[in-house]
Every structure is written in C-alpha cells, then in structure tokens.
Curated annotation (Swiss-Prot):
InterPro entries: SAICAR_synt/ADE2_N, SAICAR_synth, SAICAR_synthetase_CS. Keywords: ATP-binding, Ligase, Nucleotide-binding, Purine biosynthesis. It comes from Azoarcus sp. (strain BH72). GO terms for molecular function: ATP binding; phosphoribosylaminoimidazolesuccinocarboxamide synthase activity. Pathway: Purine metabolism; IMP biosynthesis via de novo pathway; 5-amino-1-(5-phospho-D-ribosyl)imidazole-4-carboxamide from 5-amino-1-(5-phospho-D-ribosyl)imidazole-4-carboxylate: step 1/2. Belongs to the SAICAR synthetase family. It catalyses: 5-amino-1-(5-phospho-D-ribosyl)imidazole-4-carboxylate + L-aspartate + ATP = (2S)-2-[5-amino-1-(5-phospho-beta-D-ribosyl)imidazole-4-carboxamido]succinate + ADP + phosphate + 2 H(+). One of its GO terms (cellular component) is cytoplasm. This is Phosphoribosylaminoimidazole-succinocarboxamide synthase. GO terms for biological process: 'de novo' IMP biosynthetic process.
Amino acid sequence: MATPLFESTIKSLPLLGRGKVRDIYAVDADKLLIVTSDRLSAFDVILPNPIPDKGRVLTAMANFWFAKLGHIVPNQLTGIDPESVVAADEREQVKGRALVVKRLKPLPIEAVVRGYVIGSGWKDYQDTGAICGIALPAGLKQAAKLPAPIFTPASKAEVGDHDENISFAQAQANCDAVLAEALAGTGKTGAGLAEEARQAAIALYSQAADYAAGRGIIIADTKFEFGIDAAGTLHLIDEALTPDSSRFWPADSYREGISPPSYDKQYVRDYLETLDWNKKAPGPDLPADVVERTAAKYREAYEKLTGLTLA
C-alpha cells in the first residue's frame, strides 16, 4: 500500500485548482494533468483523513471503463504518461493516480443516471411518485429496479456546496447559457448537447450495468461529466463509474425494501451519521478502523469489477 496523498504539490506545472478529490495542473494550452488524491468528501465536506490507495483505485477504475466504453462516446484521455510531464522528483506523486487529459469545456451539469430507486431518488419518489419530475409506477419499494434507466441531471456545485437536482429543460437552458460562446460557429446548441449527454449517459450506464451484473455487482446509479472540444464534440471527462461517482451493490445481498450495503463511501457516511456533527466544514477525524474498512471497500470494488489486482 502506497503512502496516502492528501494533496499533491507539483511545482513544475501551474496549479489551476483543487476539487474535492482532484488537483488540476496546466501541461500546455491543450492539455491538463489531473492528480487524483486520497481525499474523501462526505456530505460535500472534505474530511481530514486520506483513504490509502483511494486515488489509485479511482484512476485504475476510470481507465478500465474509458477503455471498455470508448466506442460509445469520445473521452478525455491523451495516452500521454503522466510521469513524463512532471519533474523527476515529482513522479512518485503522480504514479498510478494521474491522467494527462485534453483541455475541454465542461457542460454545466452533472449527468446522473439512475437504475434503482435509492438515495435522494427514493425520498423524491416517496414524496411525489416521481424522481426529478419523471413519473414512475406506483408501489415501488426502496431499492427497486426501475423499468428503464432514467436521466436526472443536477446543477454543478462549488466545493462545499450541494449539487441540486434540476429538470432536463433546466439542464438544456444551463447548457445554452454557458456554452453559447464556445459553440459559436459549430452549428451546435447547448440544448442539443444536453440531449447528446442524456443519450450518451444512458448508453454508458446500460452497458456498464450489464457488464457489472456478470461480475456480481449491481450499479444502482452513477454520475458522469461531459465536456466539448473546439468543434463542439461531446467527450466523457472527469471520472467514470468509480465508487466515488456510483453506487455499487453486491448482487448476492440485494433485495428490495432495504438500502443494500455498497462498495463506496457509504460506510463513512453511516459512521458520520452517528456523530453530533452539523455536516459543515471542518469535518471530523475518522477512526483508523473506518479508514481501513473504507480503503478495503474501494479495493474490493475495483478487483471484483475488473478481475484485476491493484498494482
């Protein structure tokens, strides 16, 4: 197990920003270096304890899915070795946990696909009989499989804020407003790209869910992000189908009517719910056993899904 990395310090490249988990550096005008740290956020708060190997698991899993699903939509990968774009004494920070990616203009939405009634979708369904305004059959139980996957976009939040579910019409309006300048002269519209993103997200989820089912894992829901190049071509960016962006359930313990155990940070969320904490920064320290159990869950998810062992 490698030494945990809470925050990268790449001095040889300009730092553009830090997200909840990823640190982003400029390689040149066309490319970025994205370093996936071992930071963990819960309830949109970054917690003080890194989770060993988490960044390496997320990077390896994203690479696995980018390769498997690359025929559906282009992605951000350049194929350039991250160790080749940093100084020699910085290579250990990027080894196994970084990607050199194309610089793309992000769509201003989170592309969420749900295959099961769980989480905020379950709460919404109980209140309204719908999820994000999409009407569903009556009488569904918690964790029930939906008749078909649904696309439920969310607005993108700044670090520390919460993403908010929005209607598809609002997603189209947001894309029109934010992408108008970038799309000038391409013949494309933001609303049209939102529709492309919806179709791509459902196709990505459906093929991934079929594959995962054969490995004994249910992908209950997931979140994608998309960006465009100068021609307005849609690309899959950020991460893909990782324990941070998805809800993975072991198929052998799944049943309707309960919230199934999952291969993700739910173990941390459950622990935090036992504390007297207001879910605002700063987050509380995690006990060693919670850190270790969470690290094991991430590795197990990768190994079960891919059949590979983390190097």
